UniProtKB/Swiss-Prot annotation:
Gene field: CLDN12
Major site of localization recorded for this protein: other
Cytoplasmic side, ranges: 1-10, 109-135, 196-244
Domain of life: Eukaryota
Lineage: Eukaryota, Metazoa, Chordata, Craniata, Vertebrata
Modified residues (Phosphoserine): 228, 231
Name listed for the protein in its UniProt record: Claudin-12
Keyword Cell membrane attached: yes
Alphabetical list of InterPro entries matching this protein: Claudin12, Claudin_CS
Parts of the chain that traverse the membrane: 11-31, 88-108, 136-156, 175-195
Entry's family note: Belongs to the claudin family.
Subcellular location: Cell junction, Tight junction; Cell membrane
Entry GO CC: bicellular tight junction; plasma membrane
Segments in the Extracellular topological domain: 32-87, 157-174
Keywords: Cell junction, Cell membrane, Membrane, Phosphoprotein, Tight junction, Transmembrane, Transmembrane helix
Length: 244
């Protein structure tokens, strides 16, 4: 595995991360988190289904595409605890995942466009590409946890609502989209962890990042004139002893 080159695992993880973030965006905006089905026994009327999202609410007849009632201010009056938690959890997860994508992109760009000749003056400013991938993997795992937990809670909260009222509540496909996107974030983190563990040197500690520049760079030292003033301890002073 070419650890000092852009590997297929890092590119695949970056693309998987983009797809997962796009899925989280879609799940956040979809008005299909919960549906309430109202059945009428009048043959002259149609059944009504109320679709509840995180930000809007829509009511439509069965077989219809137009909303009879569209509540655009639903986000400020959400009375269901699981949806209220999702209003904060999903945007937070998206922000964390976007930060992870940025770190992953920085690591890949540094690996692809790094100079083969090390510059000792920029040694302290070099970006550690492998360290970026490691931190990005941790952030992807955190984003997946933040988005997956409240999304699964919606399923159990529907069971609670059906027991408390009537069995007319059901979760909609926005739950599936978000759960699948959270799974994509976990897959992205797993790919980055596998790449890092396969490339790291085994004797080194697990948390020690890889160096993106050639190892020979550590053997370079600045000229004597560029060093700071050496103390008496650092300078080997010959000791002359007088014998009588």
């Amino acid at each position: 595995m070419g650890c000092r080159d852009v590997h297929a695992a890092t590119v695949l993880s970056f693309l998987c991360g983009i797809a997962s973030v796009a899925g989280l965006f879609a799940g956040t905006l979809l008005p299909n988190w919960r549906k309430l089905r109202l059945i009428t026994f009048n043959r002259n009327e149609k059944n009504l289904t109320v679709y509840t999202g995180l930000w809007v609410k829509c009511a439509r007849y069965d077989g219809g595409n137009d909303c009879l009632m569209y509540d655009a201010a639903w986000y400020s009056s959400v009375d269901q605890l699981d949806l209220r938690v999702l209003q904060f959890a999903l945007p937070l997860s998206i922000l964390i995942a976007m930060g992870a994508l940025l770190l992953c992109l920085i690591g890949m760009c540094n690996t692809a466009f790094r100079s083969s000749v090390p510059n000792i003056k920029l040694a302290k400013c070099l970006v550690n590409s492998a360290g970026c991938h490691l931190v990005a993997g941790l952030l992807f795992f955190l984003a997946g946890t933040v988005s997956l937990s409240p999304s699964i809670w919606v399923i159990f909260y529907n069971i609670h609502l059906n027991r408390k009222f009537e069995p007319v509540f059901a979760f909609d496909y926005a739950v599936y989209v978000t759960v699948a996107s959270a799974g994509g974030l976990f897959m992205t983190a797993l790919l980055l962890f596998i790449w890092y563990c396969a490339c790291k040197s085994l004797p080194s500690p697990f948390w020690q990042p890889l160096y993106s520049h050639p190892p020979g760079m550590h053997t370079y030292s600045q000229p004597y004139s560029a060093r700071s003033r050496l103390s008496a301890i650092e300078i080997d002073i010959p000791v002359v002893s007088h014998t009588t």
